[in-house]
């Protein structure tokens, strides 16, 4: 279980309120697929993934990225119950989609990079540490069914 301090929760929620989920989600998922191309195997029905520009411009990738990042909104609202919050998604990704649990960690790191790139100086070391803790907790919760 991940424990968040009041300061960490405040840093996470303060930044989250400013996140454009559609934009950041599309960028995060797109970057994941570009930097870690083996993750594309789960998105073969999403159309053209032949190049970085095709991936970043793909409307299905953008839509799914938004959906993925919206689930992080659930984490922001329930930081003390990440395992419960992601129990059904963990089951889906483990039993039906057969996603490598390491991919959750990779996506979390990409999300942190996208947020840092967007928010610049506002993404202080303290904010980065809080968000890194959050994405690590979410990755662990999503991988729970695998254990």
Curated annotation (Swiss-Prot):
Gene3D superfamilies, alphabetized: Globins
Pfam families in alphabetical order: Globin (PF00042)
Tissue and organ expression note: Red blood cells.
Record-linked CDD domains: Hb-beta-like
Functional description taken from the UniProt entry: Gamma chains make up the fetal hemoglobin F, in combination with alpha chains.
Disulfide links within the chain: none
GO BP, one annotated term: hydrogen peroxide catabolic process
An example molecular function term from Gene Ontology annotations: heme binding
Binding site for heme b: 64, 93
Keywords: Heme, Iron, Metal-binding, Oxygen transport, Transport
PROSITE patterns: GLOBIN
Gene Ontology annotations for the cellular component aspect, listed alphabetically: blood microparticle; haptoglobin-hemoglobin complex; hemoglobin complex
Assembly with partners or alone: Heterotetramer of two alpha chains and two gamma chains in fetal hemoglobin (Hb F).
Globin domain boundaries: 3-147
Family label: Belongs to the globin family.
Protein's UniProt name: Hemoglobin subunit gamma
Cross-referenced PANTHER family: HEMOGLOBIN FAMILY MEMBER, HEMOGLOBIN SUBUNIT EPSILON
InterPro entries: Globin, Globin-like_sf, Globin/Proto, Hemoglobin_b, Hemoglobin_oxygen_transport
Source species of the chain: Dugong dugon
């Amino acid at each position: 279980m991940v424990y968040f301090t009041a300061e960490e929760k405040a840093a996470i929620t303060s930044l989250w309120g400013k996140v454009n989920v559609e934009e950041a989600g599309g960028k995060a998922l797109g970057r994941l697929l570009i930097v870690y191309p083996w993750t594309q195997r789960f998105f073969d029905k999403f159309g053209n993934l032949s190049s970085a520009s095709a991936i970043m411009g793909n409307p299905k990738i953008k839509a799914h990225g938004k959906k993925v990042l919206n689930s992080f909104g659930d984490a922001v609202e329930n930081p003390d119950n990440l395992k419960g919050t992601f129990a059904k998604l963990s089951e889906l990704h483990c039993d039906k989609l057969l996603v490598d649990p390491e991919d959750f960690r990779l996506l979390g790191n990409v999300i942190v990079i996208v947020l840092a790139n967007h928010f610049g100086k506002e993404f202080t070391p303290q904010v980065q540490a809080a968000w890194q803790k959050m994405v690590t907790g979410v990755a662990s919760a999503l991988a729970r069914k695998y254990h």
